[in-house]
Amino acid sequence: MASGSVAECLQQETTCPVCLQYFAEPMMLDCGHNICCACLARCWGTAETNVSCPQCRETFPQRHMRPNRHLANVTQLVKQLRTERPSGPGGEMGVCEKHREPLKLYCEEDQMPICVVCDRSREHRGHSVLPLEEAVEGFKEQIQNQLDHLKRVKDLKKRRRAQGEQARAELLSLTQMEREKIVWEFEQLYHSLKEHEYRLLARLEELDLAIYNSINGAITQFSCNISHLSSLIAQLEEKQQQPTRELLQDIGDTLSRAERIRIPEPWITPPDLQEKIHIFAQKCLFLTESLKQFTEKMQSDMEKIQELREAQLYSVDVTLDPDTAYPSLILSDNLRQVRYSYLQQDLPDNPERFNLFPCVLGSPCFIAGRHYWEVEVGDKAKWTIGVCEDSVCRKGGVTSAPQNGFWAVSLWYGKEYWALTSPMTALPLRTPLQRVGIFLDYDAGEVSFYNVTERCHTFTFSHATFCGPVRPYFSLSYSGGKSAAPLIICPMSGIDGFSGHVGNHGHSMETSP
């Protein structure tokens, strides 16, 4: 048997099958296997019965083991033999099994240690060979580089985890705050409704008492009259059956008493009670209608907020393309604001530029997916915003309509809002638009507009057919007064907690200014 094989056998015999290290206080079990004392303690825990061998899984009714001192001594000898091996790369690696020479070289092609005879052999001729020590140092350097890289990645992962934990805590704190606000608001609403309920029920109690007090006297009087009439009827019936002599006695008085009885007037409910009940019923009807309107408005507002929030999930940052701007339009340095000037700039008449109407396009181009952005129109009196195809005519007259590749809404002279359909559609808005949200669903062929301030839907172009890339579209003119203020594209990063390009499930093409 080769010496290397003997060494391997000795190492296997002195290695714990659980921790795969040299035995430390080996304990022999009834099945004959040896396990480190500490390993047995970890495997068995506090169990005293029905324990099993970690190696062969044989079960023992009682916890029984005994120290194997002989194996412990052999283990110490094997460890000493390994520490007394010859030093140096050749001694550490051993000798070449083929040539019985020390392994002092390393073949880079075959990635294995070799001896000097192997280096001269045909098998390794022409291979890149390094001294073993140099190869080991190189590998150690590579390992160190990988260790440094992995440690950096680990540190980054830890920071990301900490950021995630912080974000989770902050978001959960926000949801808890919202939860507490909802509970508080509904408690206030509940108490308010309960107070109204108590007041209405108390008013009903007052009406009940008024009804009793007002009608009970009349009912008591009727009861007395009925009792008197019953007595008189009984007397007349008795008189009617008497013999002639008795019947004629006091007949005049008897008939006179009957004749004095008058037919009662028709019953009339006290009008003041009817009026009070009518007023109360009107209050209840008003309350019912108010609660119904409140419920419907709350449901409608929740749906509006949800619809707008879903659109805002597809937020993109839009900027103005100066190569397309009409010369009278002045763009800001950050390409997010545009205002009208009577003085035209001296700009090149490139093919992309509008040369007759005060229009400018935005970037990027959209070729698929869903995209949302917002525009601050403020108090401007004349403007048009929306989307258009990138291929629209830039020179000469242009009519903003779907058949020409435009899908937009417009304000005329600060009074009339229009959707530029064909023919145009009037938009009877309850409140003026200050901030407009534009939502493009390219694949569905829809362009929607929202009143961001009121959180409500304004208009949607449906069944649009886009022939190529689509771009944000802006047009404005000067009409004096407040309308001289710029039209502003709102930065979408951080809008109400949303980040730009969150959920932008689509494709866009950047256009370089």
UniProtKB/Swiss-Prot annotation:
Pfam families reported for this sequence: PRY, SPRY, zf-B_box, zf-C3HC4_4
Cell compartments where the protein resides: Nucleus; Cytoplasm; Nucleus, PML body; Early endosome
S-S pairs: none
Pathway stated in the Swiss-Prot or TrEMBL entry: Protein modification; protein ubiquitination
EC identifiers of the protein: 2.3.2.27
Gene Ontology molecular functions: DNA binding; identical protein binding; metal ion binding; nucleic acid binding; SUMO transferase activity; transcription coactivator activity; ubiquitin protein ligase activity; ubiquitin-protein transferase activity
Swiss-Prot/TrEMBL catalytic activity: S-ubiquitinyl-[E2 ubiquitin-conjugating enzyme]-L-cysteine + [acceptor protein]-L-lysine = [E2 ubiquitin-conjugating enzyme]-L-cysteine + N(6)-ubiquitinyl-[acceptor protein]-L-lysine
Transmembrane segments: none
Segments forming domain B30.2/SPRY: 298-492
Disease affiliated with this protein: A chromosomal aberration involving TRIM27/RFP is found in papillary thyroid carcinomas (PTCs). Translocation t(6;10)(p21.3;q11.2) with RET. The translocation generates TRIM27/RET and delta TRIM27/RET oncogenes.
PANTHER family: E3 UBIQUITIN-PROTEIN LIGASE TRIM
This protein's name: Zinc finger protein RFP
Biological source species: Homo sapiens
